[in-house]
C-alpha cells in the first residue's frame, strides 16, 4: 500500500505517478517447528514497486507507455544492496564483485539536494545502477553471447532487460513477460495528449494562484494608502 500511496502522491504533485510490476517474488514467512528449528515458509507473491519520476527516463519520442520503445530506471544502491542482486536470477556475480571493487560511482544530479532540502555535498557512498527495458538488435545480443530461444532465431530485434553498473553489464536477459511488455505503468493526474508526463494539481492551480496573489497585493497596497497621513485644508 505504501507504493500505491507514493505513486498517488507524485501523480497529484508532479502530474505523473510511476508503478513498476507486477513481479512474482519469493516471500519468506518465519516459522519454527515444535523442536524450535527455524523452518521458514516460502510463498510466491505478486509485488508492485513505486518508481519516482525523478529516476524514470522514458523514450523521449513517446507520448505514453504503449508508444515507448524503451525506458531506463536509475537506482541508488549501497554495497550491501548491490551485492544482494547476486541472489536474484541471472545477475552476474563476478561482474558485481568487480563493480564493488572499483568503488562507489554515484554522481548526484543537480536537483537532488533541492529535493532533499539538505546542504549541498557531493561525496555519496553509493553506486549508480541503470536498469533498461526495451528493444535490442539481434546482432548486439549475439555479440554478448546471449542464448536466444528458438522462437527468436529469425527475429531482427528482441525485447530485453539490461542492468548496468560502472559501464559493466551485470544482467542481460530476454524480456520474460508474455505477452511481451515493458513492466512500467505511467499514471497521469490529468492527461496531456502532447506529452508523456501529465499535469498535476500545482500546475493546474498556477493561474488561479497568480490571480489570488494579485488580489492580495492589491489589498495590501490599499491598506498602505488608507493609512497615509490625511491633510484637510480649510479655506
Give names to the regions the model predicted.
Residues 1-235:
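Extended alpha-helical, oligomerization-prone segments that build pores/tubes and scaffolds
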